[in-house]
Regions:
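Conserved substrate/cofactor phosphate-moiety recognition/catalytic segment
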Residues: 36-84, 88
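The conserved Walker
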Residues: 27
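Small-molecule kinase domains that catalyze NTP-dependent phosphoryl transfer to phosphate-bearing small molecules
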Residues: 122-125, 130-178, 185-196, 201-202
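Conserved beta-strand scaffold positions in the cores of enzyme catalytic domains, especially
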Residues: 51, 116-120, 162-164
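Residue-level preference for the first positions of well-ordered beta-strands
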Residues: 18-20, 48, 92-94
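ATP-dependent NMP and nucleoside kinases share a basic, alpha-helical "lid"
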Residues: 58-67, 71, 83-141, 147
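Conserved lysine of the Walker
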Residues: 31
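Extreme N-terminal, non-catalytic leader segments
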Residues: 1-21
Length: 206
């Protein structure tokens, strides 16, 4: 007897399908701020949602990794694997990482391509530096932080993201509203359709 739980059953129970919203952007672009507010809005709707970011990944799962290009790639690979497990369990995962290299983003997408949504949190380097309350950019320019994205290491913008959120011209609230609309179409509507189909099957199509 198979006592497994299907993705369709999870979607019906949760009211949405699982998904990975992969936020990519410069430090200071607004990734974590948007991620946390979006998580709150989705949680208030009763959705299964969780944020993965440097705060909860670097202190535990990836505490053995540094910031070399190789370690950064491995950091994202591990996050991608964890996000895929969450998504396959029916959770909406919001991953907020700089993810500067296209190849690394392609690698993460390849782990769970049917669940992956590439969200570019866009802001100019100048705007990000102005928002930098921790002084990270100043330290990077002084040579105190090596391989700092945007200063001494490149950021390759996504070529075909699913959404671009320009945080220089949009408020955090406006960005979240755009994401909620996107989630409704991409993750909630498929679950609604499943519910309609299951109701029709149960009623014999009446």
């Amino acid at each position: 007897v198979d006592f497994g739980v299907t993705p369709e059953q999870r979607s019906l129970a949760n009211g949405h399908t699982g998904g990975i919203l992969w936020f990519s952007g410069l430090s200071g672009s607004g990734k974590s701020t948007i991620a946390k507010l979006l998580q709150k809005r989705l949680f208030d709707k009763g959705y299964q949602v969780f944020v993965l970011d440097g705060d909860n990944i670097r202190k535990g799962l990836n505490r053995d990794l540094g910031f070399s290009p190789e370690d950064r790639a491995e950091n994202l690979r591990r996050v991608g694997e964890v996000a895929a497990l969450f998504a396959k369990a029916g959770v909406i995962v919001i991953s907020a990482f700089i993810s500067p290299m296209r190849e690394d983003r392609r690698m993460v997408r390849s782990i769970a391509p049917n669940y992956f949504h590439n969200i570019h949190i866009k802001a100019s380097l100048e705007a990000c530096e102005k928002r930098d309350v921790k002084g990270l950019y100043a330290k990077a320019r002084a040579g105190e932080i090596p391989e700092f994205t945007g200063i001494s290491a490149p950021y390759e913008e996504p070529q075909n993201p699913d959404i671009v959120l320009d945080t220089e011209n949009l408020s955090v609230q406006a960005c979240v509203e755009q994401l909620l609309k996107y989630i409704d179409v991409q993750l909630v509507e498929p679950a609604r359709n499943l519910e309609i189909e299951s109701t029709q099957d149960y009623s014999g199509g009446i």
